[in-house]
């Protein structure tokens, strides 16, 4: 706006922007900072002053962007294109808002977000920015498909082929080729050892992923099949394994969480095994018909699954797909129900969202910049 705003002491401030938490702003707003929800932000007017604050570490930052956008008309279109409206003189708008995101973890998986941290923060996503100045990020150790990350076949398979899935009489391992033999107790011991080592440098509230590789070659050995036959389905076997890891993690630090996938052959709820309280279920929509809303009859089976997971998941995360992975350039007819799908997730108790769009080299697709915005 061409106006330089001096930084002044709070006690002597008048006609000021109060940014961040303080005893004074807490009193003026009538809030207890400790009771604020994750990433909650407040944009409030007090006489001729503005209070821009919220939950640490990102609430105040979000409040500043909120006022710039909705009070002054600034638009952050992409990392390289910003629209700053001109005004003949500086003014205070009348805009106020208090808001806490329904999803505590928010990631739009596009290169525009992944490679440009400052823009990611302006879009209120919180899984990519790593510096304190940008509010940090929600850390998920390992990301996804971590069986082969924590026990890579390239390292362990030659000495311990029995740790890996048996398929048609042959042991197979690797991210694209196989899974783990989840009933193998020696494998479980080593896996837990590795997970605890990975958690070592991380503090309270850390999340670590323990999830199947990106294939459907689950183990067909006698022990694994007997467990499935006795308890219900492949999800039971996965959760029995994940629960044992989660129990070890809880002994290490009771504030930490273990995330796993409800994906492909584990998308359905288990028959008997229930997830521990420190287990996060990330339900994936991969089999859905994305040209139709998730609450349509075309996606009835997913509606059944998410309703069932809502009943038993201590924490429910979502991995959603919002592009055509076969042809990124082809128009994807999901514009009108993107918001409806997100609302469906909220209605079923989901508290984190990962929207996988077109990404990778070039990251060019169906109006990608607009989709990110």
Regions flagged by a language model, labelled:
Residues 5-7, 257-260, 315-320, 349-357:
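Acidic/polar loop patches that form or flank catalytic/metal-binding clefts of enzymes
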Residues 217-222, 290-291, 365:
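Short acidic/His/Gly/Ser-rich catalytic and metal-binding motifs that mark active-site loops
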Residues 33-240, 247-252, 262, 280-283, ...:
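Feature activates predominantly on carbohydrate-active enzymes
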Residues 269-276, 283-324, 341:
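Glycoside hydrolase catalytic-domain groove-lining segments
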Residues 3-11, 79-80:
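Surface-exposed patches in mature extracellular/periplasmic domains of secreted proteins
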Residues 259-287, 329-337, 362-367:
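Substrate-binding cleft/loops of secretory-pathway carbohydrate-active enzymes
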Residues 8-33:
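Short, well-ordered secondary-structure micro-motifs within conserved domains or adaptor modules
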Residues 333-373:
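Substrate-binding cleft of secreted/luminal carbohydrate-active enzymes
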């Amino acid at each position: 706006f061409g106006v330089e705003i001096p930084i002044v002491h709070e006690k002597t401030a008048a006609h000021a922007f109060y940014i961040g938490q303080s005893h004074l702003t807490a009193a003026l707003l009538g809030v207890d900072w400790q009771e604020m929800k994750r990433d909650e932000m407040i944009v409030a007017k007090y006489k001729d002053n503005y209070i821009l604050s919220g939950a640490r570490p990102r609430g105040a930052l979000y409040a500043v962007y909120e006022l710039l956008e909705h009070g002054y008309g600034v638009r952050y279109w992409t990392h390289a294109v910003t629209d700053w409206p001109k005004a003949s003189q500086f003014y205070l708008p009348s805009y106020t808002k208090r808001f806490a995101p329904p999803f505590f973890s928010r990631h739009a998986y596009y290169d525009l977000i992944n490679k440009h941290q400052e823009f990611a923060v302006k879009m209120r996503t919180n899984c990519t920015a790593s510096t304190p100045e940008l509010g940090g990020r929600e850390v998920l150790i390992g990301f996804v498909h971590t069986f082969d990350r924590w026990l890579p076949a390239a390292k362990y398979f030659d000495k311990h082929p029995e740790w890996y899935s048996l398929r048609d009489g042959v042991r197979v391992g690797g991210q694209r080729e196989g899974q783990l033999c989840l009933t193998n107790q020696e494998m479980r011991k080593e896996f837990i050892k590795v997970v605890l080592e990975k958690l070592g440098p991380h503090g309270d509230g850390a999340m670590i992923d323990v999830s199947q590789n990106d294939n459907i070659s689950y183990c067909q050995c006698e022990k694994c099949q007997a467990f499935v036959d006795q308890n219900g389905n492949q999800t039971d076997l996965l959760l029995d394994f994940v629960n044992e890891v989660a129990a070890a993690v809880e002994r290490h630090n009771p504030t930490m969480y273990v995330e796993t996938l409800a994906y492909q052959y584990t998308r359905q709820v288990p028959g008997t095994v229930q997830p521990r309280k420190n287990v996060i279920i990330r339900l994936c929509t991969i089999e859905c018909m994305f040209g139709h809303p998730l609450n349509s009859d075309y996606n009835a089976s997913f509606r059944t699954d998410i309703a069932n997971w809502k009943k038993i998941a201590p924490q429910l995360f979502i991995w959603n797909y919002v592009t055509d992975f076969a042809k990124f350039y082809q128009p994807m007819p999901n514009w009108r129900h993107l918001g409806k799908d997100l609302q469906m997730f909220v209605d079923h108790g989901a508290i984190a969202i990962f929207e996988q769009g077109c990404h990778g080299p070039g990251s060019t697709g169906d109006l990608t910049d607009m989709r990110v915005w």
